[in-house]
From Swiss-Prot:
The keyword Glycoprotein does not apply. Pathway: Amino-acid biosynthesis; L-methionine biosynthesis via de novo pathway; O-acetyl-L-homoserine from L-homoserine: step 1/1. It catalyses: L-homoserine + acetyl-CoA = O-acetyl-L-homoserine + CoA. NCBIfam families: metA. One of its GO terms (cellular component) is cytoplasm. The gene is metAA. The lineage of its organism: Bacteria, Bacillati, Cyanobacteriota, Cyanophyceae, Synechococcales. The record marks 111 as: Important for acyl-CoA specificity. GO terms for molecular function: homoserine O-acetyltransferase activity; homoserine O-succinyltransferase activity. InterPro entries: Class_I_gatase-like, HST_MetA, MetA_family. It is an enzyme of class 2 (transferase). Keywords: Acyltransferase, Amino-acid biosynthesis, Cytoplasm, Methionine biosynthesis, Transferase. Substrate binds at residues 163, 192, 249. This is Homoserine O-acetyltransferase. Its main location: cytoplasm.
Length: 299
């Protein structure tokens, strides 16, 4: 089934070129199908890239999904064409009276800031509180996961001595969740973080389950079954060249950045990276849609 996105959204052209089944919102309205309603709070400066990555991993399921994109009103994005935001995004106030089947909150490049120093922190916590009643299931990514953990559970992020950067092996710790149904015991995931959450603090919260982690990269996937909240600290949705673009961007800015580990063939940044995480990414998002978003609705 298709992913329903605005007719002229740049992501649609990209996904159509990849033979990903998309459907424009105007065409979808002519069908008598109740699509799953998923709202995406996109906090990334690279909005087009991020919305494309998320649409791609949500598109390959038997379920029809309609995306609603929102951005913060308390902070005006500076790296995105204002016309793109006007045409394809809403603010929270414009959608707060609606009910959604799913919520996705992306990461954001504000990891090292204290929570209250983030311009949109108050707005974000309002959205998180709203989601308790207005959203069936939530998925939080990277900094979004850390922010939600702090808000709902009081667990603080910790700054790493150096950026954790590369493609790391992860291991399933708990198979009881349908989120990891069909996963291999060990799998690769792109990681790009300056901060982390400590496992011992998570284990102190009885309602949180650690589903997957890495001996090198730390926690990857947490699940709060009762509240239908999923916390994903890394980036299985990343494109083949995302870490490469981040590496070259930081080098051009003169920032301290090491070569992403386990990424370039022979650790040579002149070679094209090989994607070794795509199937895990697709399975995780498919499981989230099926078991956390759709099946509770159908009971």
């Amino acid at each position: 089934m298709p992913i329903i996105i605005p007719q002229d959204l740049p992501a649609r052209r990209i996904l159509d070129a990849e033979s990903v089944f998309t459907l424009g919102d105007a065409d979808a309205r002519r069908q008598d199908i109740r699509a799953l309603q998923v709202v995406v709070l996109n906090l990334m400066p690279t909005k087009v890239t991020t919305e494309t990555q998320i649409a791609r991993v949500l598109a390959n399921t038997p379920l029809q999904v309609e995306l609603t994109l929102i951005h913060t009103a308390s902070y005006q994005p500076t790296h995105t064409d204002p016309e793109h935001l006007r045409n394809f995004y809403s603010t929270f106030d414009q959608i707060r009276d609606r009910q959604f089947d799913g919520l996705i909150v992306t990461g954001a490049p504000v990891e090292t800031l204290p929570w209250l120093a983030v311009d949109y922190w108050s707005e974000l916590t309002t959205i998180l509180d709203w989601s308790r009643e207005a959203v069936r299931s939530s998925l939080f990514i990277c900094w979004g996961a850390q922010a939600a953990l702090q808000h709902f559970h009081g667990i603080e992020k910790q700054t790493l001595p150096a950026k954790r950067f590369g493609v790391f092996w992860h291991h399933l710790r708990d198979r009881s969740s349908p989120l990891v149904r069909g996963h291999d015991d060990d799998f690769l995931v792109p990681v790009s973080r300056h901060t982390e959450v400590i496992a011992a603090e998570v284990l102190a919260q009885s309602q949180l389950q650690i589903l997957a982690e890495s001996s090198e990269a730390g926690l990857h996937l947490l699940w709060d079954a009762d509240q239908h909240r999923t916390y994903l600290f890394n980036h299985p949705e990343y494109d083949a060249d995302t870490l490469d673009r981040e590496y070259r961007r930081d080098r051009e800015k003169g920032l301290p950045i090491q070569l992403p580990l386990n990424y370039y063939p022979n650790d040579d940044p002149n070679q094209v990276p090989t994607v070794r995480w795509r199937s895990h990414a697709q399975l995780l998002y498919t499981n989230w849609l099926n078991y956390e978003v759709y099946q509770p609705l159908s009971r």
